[in-house]
Amino acid sequence: LGLTLVPADIRTLSQLHQAIDPLPGDIDAIFMPHDAMLASNTRAIVAVAAVRGVPTSTPHREGVAQGALFSYGFNLYAVGRQAARLADQILSGTPATDLPIETAELDMTVNLAVADYLNLSVPEDMLRHARIAGRVGE
């Protein structure tokens, strides 16, 4: 695909800043994998990306509301509800081994305001598959 990855092993907030600050000036995008530490610092990552005019993807829809271009992943609220329901079943006496294996529902979210800011057009087929395709905060 002609991609060059610039991986960063990030476990602390200081490592996050050490990884973001020296990013090459010619990067085309920032991809954030599923990671609680990165998710809790999405605003900082997106702020750097916005200054550089670089699109960012996150694994959760909440990251799009914080300024990422798009996400394909889980909804934190829905995952919390799912976890609470399963915890309630276990606390009510259902053995954990009797619970079915469940995965979180994945969806795509697109931030059209960020696309406009970055002067990017979002393909119609991508918008058709997006669960939410709106402006910041929608």
Task: Specify the residue positions occupied by each region the protein language model found.
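Short hydrophobic alpha-helices and adjacent helix-cap/hinge residues
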Residues: 1-138
